[in-house]
């Protein structure tokens, strides 16, 4: 549903999933092959390899498995289209889920933050908004019986376009007080803007990030 609020001309706004009904349409396989031929090329791809083997062995491993990918010398697939059509904002989308669930999601267009990658400002703001300690936004909403959980952070990252989302799992009572919850969200955002950055919170986030990296489970 949030995709309905994006710029309809942007590729990300297109339907990105299928089911037995949509995937049974005739000609789909041929269309997929045409898309592969027109859009997939080695010069558009990047690969990161991590392993304990010597560098020469890793290089040979990659060559053995990926050299058959054709290089069609295609131009960059990046688009300069904005992710959001500002003339359509603010935009409200309501949908009925297939399961018993109540979610309130706020999606904000934000400037590109690549120049600040070493400081990761969106993660810092997401950490503040998503904190679960006493006095936090979630703790306040829980005390009123409005929410079960909250997450915040960067949700879409495209060339020159990004978005930041705040998603709250609502109780039935919270669903009936959506406008009040939205007001509380913006009150918290204004509080962050007014108080600025606390060094101890930045250090807290750094400590959490270091611990997550150190104890991250290996994946295959």
Where do the PLM segments sit?
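Charge-rich, well-structured scaffold segments of protease-associated domains
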Residues: 1-77, 83-87, 92-121, 127, ...
């Amino acid at each position: 549903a949030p995709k309905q609020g994006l710029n309809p001309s942007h590729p990300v706004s297109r339907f990105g999933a299928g089911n037995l009904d949509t995937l049974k349409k005739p000609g789909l396989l041929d269309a997929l092959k045409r898309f592969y031929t027109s859009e997939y090329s080695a010069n558009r791809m990047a690969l990161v390899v991590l392993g304990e083997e010597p560098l020469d062995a890793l290089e040979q491993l990659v060559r053995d498995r990926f050299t058959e990918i054709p290089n069609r010398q295609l131009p960059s697939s990046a688009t300069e289209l904005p992710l959001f059509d500002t003339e359509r904002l603010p935009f409200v989308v309501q949908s009925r889920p297939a399961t018993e669930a109540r979610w309130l999601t706020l999606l904000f267009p934000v400037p590109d933050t690549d120049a600040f990658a070493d400081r990761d400002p969106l993660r810092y703001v997401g950490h503040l908004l998503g904190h679960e300690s006493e006095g936090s936004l979630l703790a306040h909403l829980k005390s009123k019986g409005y929410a079960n959980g909250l997450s915040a952070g960067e949700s879409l990252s495209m060339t020159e376009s990004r978005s930041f989302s705040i998603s709250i799992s609502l109780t039935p009572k919270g669903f009936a007080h959506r406008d009040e919850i939205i007001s509380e969200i913006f009150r918290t955002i204004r509080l962050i803007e007014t108080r600025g950055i606390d060094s101890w919170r930045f250090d807290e986030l750094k400590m959490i990030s270091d611990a997550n990296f150190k104890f991250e489970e290996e994946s295959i």
